[in-house]
Amino acid sequence: MADTERTFVMVKPDGVQRGLIGDIVSRFEDRGLKLVAGKFMQIDDELAREHYAEHVDKPFFDELKEFITSGPVFAMVWEGQDAVAQVRTMMGETDPAESAPGTIRGDFGLDLGRNVIHGSDTEPGSAEREIGLFFDDDELQDYERIDEPWLYE
């Protein structure tokens, strides 16, 4: 598969509690992305601070940390052509009220604080940093989907 990349995606506690993991995974698989890692986990305060380091000094950080540590999350790594951009498009805008119908947040998000999903941003190195926070190298699987020759030139 040429020009593939990996990206980090997390179903947040509100998405887990509402039983949306299967719907979200199906959307990415249907798009042709390949799941190369996934696990349920509980984020602790330290990981929340590392993951959201750019927000630590912002007024909303404590509320964000409280939410992201309030219940289990489903952390994933997806692979495919332009995976970061594809996932960001499929997620929709951060605020579900501004997300188009058909996007994950447009269909499932309730409000800015309960927007169901996180995905790596397009800043260089962002996806790699987040993948490294949540997964060890030996947790990432390399395999070929049987439909890859049909999906990619």
UniProtKB/Swiss-Prot annotation:
Its cofactor is Mg(2+). The active site is at H118. Its EC number is 2.7.4.6. It is found in: Cytoplasm. ATP binds at K12, F60, R88, T94, R105, N115. One of its GO terms (cellular component) is cytoplasm. GO terms for molecular function: ATP binding; metal ion binding; nucleoside diphosphate kinase activity. GO terms for biological process: CTP biosynthetic process; GTP biosynthetic process; UTP biosynthetic process. It catalyses: a 2'-deoxyribonucleoside 5'-diphosphate + ATP = a 2'-deoxyribonucleoside 5'-triphosphate + ADP; a ribonucleoside 5'-diphosphate + ATP = a ribonucleoside 5'-triphosphate + ADP. Its main location: cytoplasm. It is an enzyme of class 2 (transferase). The keyword Phosphoprotein applies. Belongs to the NDK family. Major role in the synthesis of nucleoside triphosphates other than ATP. The ATP gamma phosphate is transferred to the NDP beta phosphate via a ping-pong mechanism, using a phosphorylated active-site intermediate. This is Nucleoside diphosphate kinase. It comes from Natronomonas pharaonis (strain ATCC 35678 / DSM 2160 / CIP 103997 / JCM 8858 / NBRC 14720 / NCIMB 2260 / Gabara). The lineage of its organism: Archaea, Methanobacteriati, Methanobacteriota, Stenosarchaea group, Halobacteria. The gene is ndk.
